[in-house]
Amino acid sequence: MFHGQGFSRNRCNVVAVVSGAELCDTNNQIDGTSHQPKYPFPDLSSSGRLKFQVLNNPTPEEFQVAVNSSATDFVYLQGEHSGDSDEVGPLVLGYTDFSTPDALVTLFGSTLPTTVYLELPNGEELAQALYSKGVQYVIYWKNVFSKYAACHFRHSLFSVIQSSCSDTWDVFHVAEASFRLYCTSDNAVLPSNSNRKMNYEMGPCLLGEPPKIDVVSPEADELEEENSLESLPSIKIYDEDVTVRFLLCGPPCTVDTFLLGSLMDGLNALLRIEMRGSKLHNRSSAPAPPLQAGTFTRGVVTMRCDVSTCSSAHISMLVSGNAQTCFSDQLLENHIKHEVVEKIQLVHSVVNSEETKRGFSEPRRSASIACGASVCEVSMQVPTWALQVLRQLAPDVSYRSLVVLGVASIQGLSVASFEKDDAERLLFFCGQQINDTSNHDALLSKIPNWLTPPLPTRKRSEPCRESKEIENGGPTSRKINVAALRPIPHTRRHKMIPFSGYSEIGRFDGDHTKGSLPMPPKHGASGGTPVTHRKAFSGSYQRKQIISLNPLPLKKHDCGRAHIQVCSEEEFLRDVMQFLLIRGHTRLVPPGGLAEFPDAVLNSKRLDLFNLYREVVSRGGFHVGNGINWKGQVFSKMRNHTLTNRMTGVGNTLKRHYETYLLEYEYAHDDVDGECCLICRSSTAGDWVNCGSCGEWAHFGCDRRPGLGAFKDYAKTDGLEYVCPNCSVSNYRKKSQKTSNGGLLVP
């Protein structure tokens, strides 16, 4: 984990010790009448970063062998679950009771894990004993608690660890905020008539120190009075707060400070996880904010920093600080982390507004939001960069931390990892769900404007009919496929929002740009090798638009496909189909498989994805945009092209197909040709032309030779053949060598 604390970066090894009976399965139901909801107990199974080793009633020797042999990061000790009681009992292994501090300490040998979670009643003294023995973090319960509250907290804890590389300190605070939201009787979202709720003081606790971020300069030892944090130059991050509307899984209720405080603490901890594991990829000089420029002292510089978070969300920040800080990559990265994690309250509740004074309105239910469960609306203020992070994490089906907090939608964007069992677990603590249709219709009058339902006369789709039939309790022949109902984004291009008060065009002429963004690893390789980028051209056109070769740090698709220039079309299409299925885009893959893929027609022929992809990546990738002549340079190489073609708008059609089928695939593979313009040596967007002699690419606008035609004359099908300046000189020299005797050609 960060600076040696927490879990390993790639995997978290967990040893789970279950005492008494085995883990409760999903068939367990509350004792009582049949109308009471069933609680789906999750299994302890390996997923994502989590690797579980479950031990049922092990001996102390078996436990120590498991801890020593697997480089254990996390030990989970579960108390007894008796069938006639909902309360969790002490830790009993075989016939030995380990409910005393001395007995529990003897269970651990010389090898200690980073974190121990004691799911045992009255565990404060036990936790103190383990903490004194040397365990960095100990999670425990002060009092007696129910197995339902314990399961909710445990599932929240492991879901956050599964999703991202995180520290125990932040993981605990996300899970503890979820516990306060759904398991305590003080919460206004949850009715207080349920005996399954607990008081907040009875919740889980943590022993341990928060991880520190080292911001000491490597050269500080050589300088006087620079051995402490206070003597080092600090930075300032310029960003604006925006109001964000969240949909939380739960019945509608009235806003109160307890609800807002719990959600605020959970989101703050979640964003701290993302920024604690962030990485600075690029920094460049930038103008100061217009309203702040007059307050800068001498020596203060402003930098535009491109940062990727722990879960590969890409953001851009405008920061200012001392030159020593801003021109050192590692020092600047650590200062940004320190400023965000330890100094700034990222999320703020919306106070003194109309929305906090009136009751919640219940938005219209949707199968793509919390799997059709009831939701309520909450507004919070977050920085602009934090909103970008949350919106990039929401469509990720493997990211479970938002589900832990019950967040089902962010500004209308649904959280893709929300499952039906998640909704049932959260609503279990909310008591009886609101199913009365009259009350539901009355609440529809207060729907937020951004979730206004369609007109009643609009024809409903088949999935909507199936969803409504299930809600009404009608018979259904097959289980609804929730994943197929989720909206499929046409692009996962993470937009980097610049500062609103200035334009990137106005960068300083004396920019000290340092591109430290490493090239992604070669396709199929296990690790990444940094590749030095060509130095960007410093002309005025370059300052207007600088585009990286890999604008989105997406997880690579680990497959064995050959390079795009040598692989076969069948191999390519199979790889694309597999990638789309992994990404959850099942609707793009027809039932017939490869014989029917892709299910798109262009110019009366099946869309030629293979040649479309090859031509685009050979010209710099989709982000080059209009620098590619889609009709003249791409469409003419596809099987869909005909000599008698009379199609209009084919360029926009190809772009839409590429965004739908191939854009994410391009970002997850290293097929983009990173060659630069042979004249200006840059890879920016522009009017690209290909030399017919050497095959190199150049910006047509960079070629200032007289006598050239217009760009459209070279870009159109069967147009003029472009010959670059280098080849023109070479051809002229060859002709000169072949001529003699007054210019007569020697045979």
From Swiss-Prot:
Q: Where is the ARID domain?
A: 566-670
Q: Which PROSITE patterns match?
A: ARID
Q: What is its main location?
A: nucleus
SMART domains in alphabetical order: ARID, BRIGHT, PHD
Localization recorded for this chain is: Nucleus
Q: Where is the composition biased (Basic and acidic residues)?
A: 459-471
State where the PHD-type zinc fingers lie. 674-730
Write down the Gene3D superfamilies for this protein, in alphabetical order: ARID DNA-binding domain (1.10.150.60), Zinc/RING finger domain, C3HC4 (zinc finger) (3.30.40.10)
Keyword hit for Cell cycle:
no
| Chain residue ranges for the region called Disordered | 454-475
Keywords recorded for this protein, A-Z: DNA-binding, Metal-binding, Nucleus, Transcription, Transcription regulation, Zinc, Zinc-finger
GO CC annotations on file: nucleus
Oxidoreductase recorded as keyword: no
The highest taxon in the source lineage is: Eukaryota
A Gene Ontology molecular-function term?
Answer: DNA binding
Q: What is this protein called?
A: AT-rich interactive domain-containing protein 4
Primary gene name: ARID4
